[in-house]
Regions:
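Conserved N-terminal beta-strand and adjoining loop/helix that marks the start
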Residues: 1-17
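Structural detector for helix-capping/boundary residues
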Residues: 7, 15, 33, 47, ...
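Conserved hydrophobic "DFG−1" position in protein kinase catalytic cores
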Residues: 11-12, 19, 88, 105
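Conserved Nudix-box catalytic region and its N-terminal flanking loop in Nudix hydrolases
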Residues: 12-52, 56
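Short aromatic/basic micro-patch
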Residues: 29, 80, 105
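A short coil-to-beta-strand element that immediately follows conserved catalytic motifs
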Residues: 56-66
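Active-site-adjacent beta-strand/loop module that shapes the phosphate/pyrophosphate-binding cleft
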Residues: 68-94, 125
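NUDIX/MutT-family hydrolases
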Residues: 87, 95-126
Length: 132
């Protein structure tokens, strides 16, 4: 079994979670991405969020939320994504980068347009009554 190691930023506003859709895709993903060689989770998170949304994560505000594993969306069976999720504040104005078609605040009504691992995260946030 192959695992794709990723980190994600859980940004909640008005009981909804920030999600992004890459250009050419129809599925939304929680912002974040794969680590580069030698990076810590926080370094990866800061870099990926700056690249995708042009904001600066406030490192001192970052808190671990949980790790979620599911079939990788769009990959062959047996390829799994392991997503380490963090909550944290930011500075700046959210702006979709050139690789991001749009960002959107999603609720439980949007469960059909998100990836497999994101569904597990959504269910956890719903159970904790963090999103609705």
């Amino acid at each position: 079994m192959k695992y794709i190691d990723k980190v994600a930023w859980l940004l909640i506003k008005d009981n909804k979670i920030l999600s992004t859709r890459s250009k050419g895709k129809d599925t939304f993903y929680i912002p974040g991405g794969k680590r580069e060689l030698g990076e810590t989770d926080i370094q990866t998170l800061v870099r990926e969020i700056k690249e995708e949304l042009d904001v600066d994560i406030i490192k001192e505000s970052v808190n671990y939320y949980g790790t979620f594993t599911a079939q990788s969306h769009g990959d062959i069976a047996g390829v799994k994504v392991q997503m380490k999720c963090y909550l944290g504040l930011y500075e700046g104005t959210l702006t979709a980068s050139s690789e991001i078609a749009e960002y959107r605040w999603l609720s439980s009504d949007d469960i059909e347009i998100i990836s497999h691992v994101d569904k597990l995260i959504f269910f956890s946030l719903l159970k904790s009554e963090i999103i609705f």
